[in-house]
């Protein structure tokens, strides 16, 4: 089984997140995508963070595809930081092939994540295009560090077979929705 792991605050979740999930399922040939709602992000302020239960419920409404499973692994496992969560999820599911899914907009700060290089050396990574990040991903520390491990997006369906580090950038439809803009009132409605 091939499973995409798509983590984030989802504060609030919106159709742009659902689009990233759908692109990942289609282009990577995923059997499932686990939408991992985090209790909090150490790189973001918690002042405007909606309660976890609310973000999970909203994520379930947005993620209409039955192959998408909304989870709260970090809370359930009692861990924080993506690297720790992913290590525990992998240890509990040794026969599953995982791919870490991230929006291209997250690449500019990925090198600030705890153990970011360990994540890249443990999981193949699929970076999904986001507005404003189509070219900026080229200058990210992750893509420069692991440039040798990039596979062509035409081979995205076999990314799960590649030993990490391996990553691809996937172009496709993009949504201009942004959780930050929705919270700031610049864009309407969080849920789809």
From Swiss-Prot:
Residues that span the membrane, as ranges: none
Coiled-coil intervals: none
Superkingdom to which the source organism belongs: Bacteria
EC number: 2.7.7.18
Catalytic activity, reaction form: nicotinate beta-D-ribonucleotide + ATP + H(+) = deamido-NAD(+) + diphosphate
Cell division recorded as keyword: no
UniProt xrefs under NCBIfam families: nicotinate (nicotinamide) nucleotide adenylyltransferase, PRK00071.2-2, PRK00071.2-4
Protein known as: Probable nicotinate-nucleotide adenylyltransferase
Record organism: Rhizobium etli (strain ATCC 51251 / DSM 11541 / JCM 21823 / NBRC 15573 / CFN 42)
Upper taxonomic lineage: Bacteria, Pseudomonadati, Pseudomonadota, Alphaproteobacteria, Hyphomicrobiales
């Amino acid at each position: 089984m091939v499973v995409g792991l798509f983590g984030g605050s989802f504060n609030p979740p919106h159709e742009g997140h659902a689009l990233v999930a759908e692109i990942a399922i289609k282009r990577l040939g995923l059997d499932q995508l686990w939408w991992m709602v985090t209790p909090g992000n150490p790189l973001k302020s918690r002042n405007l963070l909606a309660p976890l239960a609310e973000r999970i419920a909203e994520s379930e409404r947005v993620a209409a595809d039955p192959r998408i499973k909304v989870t709260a692994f970090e809370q359930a496992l009692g861990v924080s930081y993506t690297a720790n969560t992913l290590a525990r999820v992998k240890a509990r599911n040794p026969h599953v092939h995982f791919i870490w899914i991230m929006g291209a907009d997250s690449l500019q700060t990925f090198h600030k994540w705890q153990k970011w290089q360990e994540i890249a050396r443990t999981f193949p990574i699929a970076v999904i295009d986001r507005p404003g990040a189509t070219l900026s991903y080229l200058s990210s520390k992750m893509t420069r560090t692991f440039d040798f491990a990039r596979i062509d997006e035409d081979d995205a369906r076999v990314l799960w077979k590649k030993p990490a580090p391996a990553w691809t950038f996937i172009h496709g439809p993009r949504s201009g929705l942004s959780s930050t803009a929705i919270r700031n009132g610049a864009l309407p409605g969080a849920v789809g």
